[in-house]
C-alpha cells in the first residue's frame, strides 16, 4: 500500500540527469581509477630520494613479503569498497520498502521517481547509484592523495635498509666521518621492494580504511531509525574497528611507522566527512518543492462578530477611538459624527448591511455595530457646544472699501436692468426675472460649496453662526461684532432720512433739508423722466453698501439677520417664511465704532443706533449725493436710550428710518407726488426698488442655505 502511494505520484521529468551522469560524473570516476592504476601498479612515477643514516636501526626492521601480509593492498581495496557498497545497497533496499516509516519523518521526505531519456528511475536506483558512486570516487581520491604524498615525500619504511642492502664502500669514506648518506648505494636486487620501501607516509591502508569506515558510519547514522537502539552502534563500531585493525597491522608488521598510520587516519576521515556532507547531502532526500498555498481569505463578517458588544464596552477610550476612528478626526474642534460605510461585497449576503460608526466619544451603547437592516440605525447625538451657538462678526466700515463695493453693485445693477426696467408703480414687478434669480442662486450655491470645501481642507471651521449678545444692566443688551475670516454677513441698513412729505418738520432744520434736496435735484438735471431703455442709477449709500458687501463675500447671506433678531435656539431651524417678518435690525453704517443694539420694550424688533460724532462728515457717493453732508447731532440718542424715545422725536435729516421691505411698511404710496422733493423722491423710489430686489435675493439665498443646513443635519 505504501509502495502504491509512491508509485501513484506523478514522476518528474529531468533533462540533466543522464547527461550529467554520462559526461561529468562517470568520466571523473574513470579518470581517477586510471590514475590510480598508473600510480600503484606501474613504476612510471618514482618517489623522491631521501638520505639516511648509516646503520640506522629504525630502518633495519625485517621485511615481510607482500603475500605474507595480513591485509594486502588488493584485499584492502576490495574490502574498503565491497563492504560499504553492500551495506549501502541493503540499506537502500530497506528504505525503499519502508520509506514512509523511515523517510517520512526526515526533513527531506520521500523521493519520487524521475523520467529521464525515456526511462523511469525510482528512488532506490537513484539513491544507490549516487551513494555508492560517491563512495567509489572517495576511495579513488583517497588513494590518489596518499600516493601523491608518498611520492612527494619519499620517506623510508622501517624495512628500507633490509631491502636496500647499502654498499658503504662505494662512499669512499667511513660512516664515522660522514654518517648521513644521500647517494644511492643500494645493492639489493628486488627493485619493487626498494621502491615500496621509499613510500610510507602516509599509510595507504590507514587512509583507505578510515575513509570507508567514516563514510559508511555516517550513512548508518542518517538512514537507520532511532527505534533500533543497537543496530546502528554495532555497524558503526564494526567498521571503525576494521579500519583500526588495518592501520595497526601496518605498524606490527613494520610496514609503516606509527606516525604514518595516524596521519592516514586523519586524511581518510576528512575526505569521507567532506563527501558525505557536501556530495550526497548527508544522505538525505532533497527538499521537495512546495507549491505556495494562498492564504485563506479572511471572513469579514466572522471577524466582526467575534468582536462582541461586551468586549467593545470594556475597551477604554483610546483603544476604541484608535480602532474605529481615524486620528485626523479626533483632533481640533469636534465635528458632527460621520458614518463610514465599509464595502463588504465579498460576503455575498443581500440581507446584511454593516455600518461602522466612528464616534469621537468613548465607546458605549451608541457605538455598537448593527448587522441587520431591520434594526434601527444607531447614531450618536450631535455634540453641539454652547459656544458654537454664537459667533462674532466684524462689519468693515472703511470708506474706500465701501466705494469699491458700491461700484461693483452699480455694475451688477446695470447689467441686471439692461434686460428691461420693470414698472415703478407696481411693487410686484420689483422682482428680477425667475431665470436670472435661478442662475444667481446656482452660482451662489457653487461658490458656497467651494468655500466649504476650502474651509474643510484648511482645518476645523470655527463656530461662527450667531453673534454674541452681552447683557448690560441698565443699558440694554450689546452685540459685539469682532472680525472673522470668511464671508461678510448681510446686515440690513435702512435708507437715510427720506420720508413722506407730510412728515417734514416745520422747524429750522427742515428748511435746510429742503434746500439741500433742491440743490441735488438741480445738479441731477431736474425732474426729468428716465426712459425704460436707459437704466437709472440710484446711490442709496447705506443699503447698497451692505448688500454689496454680502454679494462680494459669496457666503451665507441670511445668517446674521436671523441670528441677531432672535435667540440662539429658534431661528436656525426655521425657514424664512416661518420667522417673524417684523424682526428687522437697523444700523448706522457710518458709525465710527461698533454699533450698539437697542432692545425695545415688549416684542418689538431691535434697532441698532450709533453715536454720531459732531463734525464728522460722510463720504460722497455718486452724482445724486455729491452734496450730501452729515454734521448734525441727534438729541436723545444715547447708547442706552430705547427705540420708543427716539421714535417720539421729530424726524431730522440724518435720522435712522426703519423700513420693513418684506411687508412694505414705511414705504410711500405708489402714486406719491414728487413735487416736494423732486429728484430726491425718485431716488427714494429707486432705492426701494433695489431694496425689494435685494430682499427677494436674500430670501432665496436664505431658503437654499437653510435647506442645505437641514439636509446636512439629517445626514449627521
UniProtKB/Swiss-Prot annotation:
Pfam family, one: PAP2
Any one Gene Ontology cellular component term annotated for this protein: membrane
Classification via SUPFAM superfamilies: Acid phosphatase/Vanadium-dependent haloperoxidase
Membrane topology: Multi-pass membrane protein
Transmembrane portions of the chain: 18-38, 70-90, 131-151, 205-225, 231-251, 261-281
UniProt-annotated stretches for the region Disordered: 311-335, 416-515, 548-589, 630-651, 663-693
Gene3D superfamilies to which the protein is assigned, alphabetical: Phosphatidic acid phosphatase type 2/haloperoxidase (1.20.144.10)
Phosphoserine: residues carrying this PTM: 320, 351, 426, 505, 641
Subcellular location: Membrane
Bias (Low complexity): 562-575
Annotated glycan sites: 167, 316
This protein's name: Phospholipid phosphatase-related protein type 3
Gene that specifies this protein: Plppr3
Amino acid at each position: 500500500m505504501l509502495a502504491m502511494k509512491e508509485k501513484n505520484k506523478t514522476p518528474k521529468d529531468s533533462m540533466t540527469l543522464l547527461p550529467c551522469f554520462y559526461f561529468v560524473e562517470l568520466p571523473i570516476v574513470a579518470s581517477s581509477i586510471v590514475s590510480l592504476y598508473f600510480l600503484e601498479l606501474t613504476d612510471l612515477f618514482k618517489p623522491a630520494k631521501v638520505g639516511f643514516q648509516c646503520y640506522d636501526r629504525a630502518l633495519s626492521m625485517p621485511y615481510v613479503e607482500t603475500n605474507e601480509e595480513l591485509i594486502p593492498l588488493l584485499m584492502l581495496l576490495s574490502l574498503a569498497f565491497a563492504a560499504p557498497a553492500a551495506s549501502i545497497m541493503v540499506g537502500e533496499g530497506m528504505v525503499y520498502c519502508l520509506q514512509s516509516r523511515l523517510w517520512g519523518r526526515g526533513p527531506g521526505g520521500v523521493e519520487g521517481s524521475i523520467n529521464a531519456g525515456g526511462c523511469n528511475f525510482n528512488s532506490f536506483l537513484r539513491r544507490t547509484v549516487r551513494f555508492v558512486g560517491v563512495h567509489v570516487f572517495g576511495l579513488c581520491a583517497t588513494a590518489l592523495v596518499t600516493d601523491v604524498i608518498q611520492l612527494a615525500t619519499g620517506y623510508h619504511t622501517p624495512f628500507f635498509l633490509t631491502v636496500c642492502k647499502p654498499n658503504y664502500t662505494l662512499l669512499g669514506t667511513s660512516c664515522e666521518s660522514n654518517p648521513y648518506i644521500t647517494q644511492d648505494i643500494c645493492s639489493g636486487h628486488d627493485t619493487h621492494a626498494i621502491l615500496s620501501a621509499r613510500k610510507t607516509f602516509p599509510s595507504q591502508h590507514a587512509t583507505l580504511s578510515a575513509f570507508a569506515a567514516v563514510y559508511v558510519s555516517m550513512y548508518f547514522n542518517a538512514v537507520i531509525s532511532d527505534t533500533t537502539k543497537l543496530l546502528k552502534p554495532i555497524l558503526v563500531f564494526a567498521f571503525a574497528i576494521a579500519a583500526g585493525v588495518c592501520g595497526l597491522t601496518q605498524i606490527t608488521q613494520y610496514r609503516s611507522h606509527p606516525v604514518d598510520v595516524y596521519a592516514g587516519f586523519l586524511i581518510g576521515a576528512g575526505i569521507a566527512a567532506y563527501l558525505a556532507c557536501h556530495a550526497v547531502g548527508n544522505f538525505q532526500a532533497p527538499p521537495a518543492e512546495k507549491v505556495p498555498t494562498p492564504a485563506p481569505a479572511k471572513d469579514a463578517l466572522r471577524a466582526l462578530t467575534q468582536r462582541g458588544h461586551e468586549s467593545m464596552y470594556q475597551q477604554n477610550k483610546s483603544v476604541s477611538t484608535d480602532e474605529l476612528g481615524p486620528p485626523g478626526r479626533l483632533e481640533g474642534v469636534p465635528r458632527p459624527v460621520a458614518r463610514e460605510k465599509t464595502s463588504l461585497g465579498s460576503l455575498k449576503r443581500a440581507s446584511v448591511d454593516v455600518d461602522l460608526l466612528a464616534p469621537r466619544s468613548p465607546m458605549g451603547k451608541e457605538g455598537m455595530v448593527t448587522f441587520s437592516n431591520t434594526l434601527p440605525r444607531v447614531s450618536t447625538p450631535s455634540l453641539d457646544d454652547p459656544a458654537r451657538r454664537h459667533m462674532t462678526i466684524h462689519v468693515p466700515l472703511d470708506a474706500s472699501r465701501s466705494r469699491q463695493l458700491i461700484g461693483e453693485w452699480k455694475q451688477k445693477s446695470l447689467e441686471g436692468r439692461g434686460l428691461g426696467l420693470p414698472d415703478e408703480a407696481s411693487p410686484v414687478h420689483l422682482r428680477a426675472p425667475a431665470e436670472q434669480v435661478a442662475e444667481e442662486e446656482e452660482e451662489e450655491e457653487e461658490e458656497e460649496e467651494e468655500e466649504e470645501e476650502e474651509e474643510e481642507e484648511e482645518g476645523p471651521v470655527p463656530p461662527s453662526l450667531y453673534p454674541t449678545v452681552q447683557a448690560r444692566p441698565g443699558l440694554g443688551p450689546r452685540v459685539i461684532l469682532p472680525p472673522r475670516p470668511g464671508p461678510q454677513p448681510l446686515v440690513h441698513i435702512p435708507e437715510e432720512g427720506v420720508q413722506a412729505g407730510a412728515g417734514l418738520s416745520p422747524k429750522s432744520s427742515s428748511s435746510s433739508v429742503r434746500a439741500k434736496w433742491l440743490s441735488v435735484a438741480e445738479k441731477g438735471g431736474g425732474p426729468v423722466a428716465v426712459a425704460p431703455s436707459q437704466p437709472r442709477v440710484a446711490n442709496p449709500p447705506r443699503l447698497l453698501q451692505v448688500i454689496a458687501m454680502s454679494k462680494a463675500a459669496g457666503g451665507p447671506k441670511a445668517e446674521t439677520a436671523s441670528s441677531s433678531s432672535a435667540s440662539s435656539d429658534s431661528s436656525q431651524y426655521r425657514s424664512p417664511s416661518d420667522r417673524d417678518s417684523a424682526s428687522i435690525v437697523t444700523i448706522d453704517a457710518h458709525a465710527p465704532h461698533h454699533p450698539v443694539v437697542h432692545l425695545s420694550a415688549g416684542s418689538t424688533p431691535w434697532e441698532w443706533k450709533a453715536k454720531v460724532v459732531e463734525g464728522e462728515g460722510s463720504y460722497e457717493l455718486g452724482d445724486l449725493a455729491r452734496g450730501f453732508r452729515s454734521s448734525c447731532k441727534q438729541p436723545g440718542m444715547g447708547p442706552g436710550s430705547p427705540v420708543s424715545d427716539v421714535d417720539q422725536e421729530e424726524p431730522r435729516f440724518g435720522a435712522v428710518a426703519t423700513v420693513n421691505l418684506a411687508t412694505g411698511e414705511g414705504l410711500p404710496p405708489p402714486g406719491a407726488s414728487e413735487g416736494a422733493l423732486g429728484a430726491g423722491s425718485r431716488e427714494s423710489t429707486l432705492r426701494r426698488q433695489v431694496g425689494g430686489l435685494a430682499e427677494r435675493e436674500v430670501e432665496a439665498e436664505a431658503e437654499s442655505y437653510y435647506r442645505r443646513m437641514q439636509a446636512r443635519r439629517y445626514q449627521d
